Amino acid sequence: MNLNKLKKKAAWAALDYIDPGTIIGVGTGTTIFYFIEALGTIKNLIYGAVSSSNSSTVLLKKHGIEVFDLKNFSSLAIYVDSADEINNHMQMIKGGGGALTREKIIASMSKKFVCIIDKSKKVDVLGTFPLPIEIIPMALSYIFREMIKIGGTPKYRKNVITDNGNIIIDVYNLCIKDPISMEKKINSLPGVVTVGLFASRSADIVLIGTQKGIRTINKKENR
């Protein structure tokens, strides 16, 4: 079974966590596109969605789901998103699709974070997938130097401007054994908008698409 089929399995499984009449926080990426497709089948049961990217907004509207502005809400019941990597503590690297800042804002405002992935995204230590960082353009050379200091190899993501009007660098060759500490360190650097480490706000539930079906990891059971 190819990875796209496993992504689709996980995406459809997330519907079990959607309560009628709620507004759903929706992430970005290929796995989330499957989730939006699934969400469209129950669009009459939900109130609508808050989107983390322009691309997800377009797809949500295409499936007849009303999209609301996050600034009108103090919290959301649930946020569904994927991850580029996730460790045993349900901490993640996200931002391969470039929407990391908006994703982190919605995740932080949501009572429940459901992460949907295929089995290839599960790792013991974060860092094999390059770590995305959204930065203000004038900070590029400074942030490059700071990433080299911590042992990383930064690369500018060419031809990409985020929905916020900023740029992204991807940092290779990191072995992130303390994700919370690294998240705080990088976020504290002047010019950083946000780093694609979701460690302080980790997932509450992980749904992993496997050939044998859905593997569910619950934060309470994982402690």
Swiss-Prot record:
The active site is at E103 (proton acceptor). The lineage of its organism: Bacteria, Pseudomonadati, Pseudomonadota, Gammaproteobacteria, Enterobacterales. The keyword Membrane does not apply. Pathway: Carbohydrate degradation; pentose phosphate pathway; D-ribose 5-phosphate from D-ribulose 5-phosphate (non-oxidative stage): step 1/1. GO terms for cellular component: cytosol. Its EC number is 5.3.1.6. NCBIfam families: PRK00702.1, rpiA. Belongs to the ribose 5-phosphate isomerase family. It catalyses: aldehydo-D-ribose 5-phosphate = D-ribulose 5-phosphate. Substrate binds at T28, G29, T30, T31, D81, S82, A83, D84, K94, G95, G96, G97, K121. Homodimer. It comes from the Bacteria. Keywords: Isomerase. Catalyzes the reversible conversion of ribose-5-phosphate to ribulose 5-phosphate. It comes from Buchnera aphidicola subsp. Acyrthosiphon pisum (strain APS). Coiled coil: none annotated. GO terms for biological process: D-ribose metabolic process; pentose-phosphate shunt, non-oxidative branch. Pfam families: Rib_5-P_isom_A. One of its GO terms (molecular function) is ribose-5-phosphate isomerase activity. The keyword Nucleus does not apply. It is an enzyme of class 5 (isomerase). This is Ribose-5-phosphate isomerase A.
